[in-house]
Amino acid sequence: MNKQPEDWLDEVPEDKNDDDDEIIWVSKSEIKRDAEALKDLGTELVELGKNALEKIPLDEDLLAAVELAQKIKKEGRRRQIQLIGKMLRARDVEPIQTALDKLKNRHNQQVSLFHKLETLRDRLVEEGDDVIPTVLELYPEADRQQLRSLVRNAQKEKAANKPPKSYRQIFQYLRELAEKQ
């Protein structure tokens, strides 16, 4: 048997002050969490529509994989999403994540605007002409006469238990005004 002398334990290699040689230890759990996060990002990409997907900066291979996953059902889709996650590990996902966040934020802003418009419409129908000056302050290009006519018709429809045609038209009119700004 070849025995090493016991003094080999006392030998300490010289320290090199190079930061480039530093090894960063990453736990297996952290690697799994990162892989799962990338797989979730891939799932979000697969769930996007074609128009939204065009706004995300994806290379050809990744875009083809996402489009294929959108066509596949059940178990094959799960495997394809895992492949997309694997492909994302080899890429810089920061621009992709940023573009996704912008899309989500735009959607949240639109939902918030719709809630505000619905509240304004409800106030118009309930309180009538008293709220019209508020609407004109928010949207100066609004037509007072058209708005009053829609509000009166909506109130009549509500009193007669008719379908809320004018109620919907008020919302559409308010949405058009909001989009013009």
Swiss-Prot record:
Phylogenetic classification of the source organism: Bacteria, Pseudomonadati, Pseudomonadota, Gammaproteobacteria, Enterobacterales
Keyword field contains Phosphoprotein: no
Assigned protein family: Belongs to the DarP family.
Organism: Yersinia enterocolitica serotype O:8 / biotype 1B (strain NCTC 13174 / 8081)
Alphabetic keyword roster: Cytoplasm, Ribosome biogenesis, RNA-binding, rRNA-binding
InterPro entries, per the entry: DarP, DarP_sf
Name used for this protein in its record: Dual-action ribosomal maturation protein DarP
CDD domains in the cross-refs: YjgA-like
BP GO annotations: assembly of large subunit precursor of preribosome
Residue ranges crossing the lipid bilayer per the database entry: none
CC annotations in GO: cytosol
HAMAP family for this protein: DarP
Pfam families referenced in this protein's UniProt entry, alphabetically: DarP (PF04751)
Molecular-function GO terms, alphabetical: ribosome binding; rRNA binding
Predominant localisation class: cytoplasm
Top-rank lineage group of the source organism: Bacteria
Signal peptide: none
Subcellular location: Cytoplasm
Biological role: Member of a network of 50S ribosomal subunit biogenesis factors which assembles along the 30S-50S interface, preventing incorrect 23S rRNA structures from forming. Promotes peptidyl transferase center (PTC) maturation.
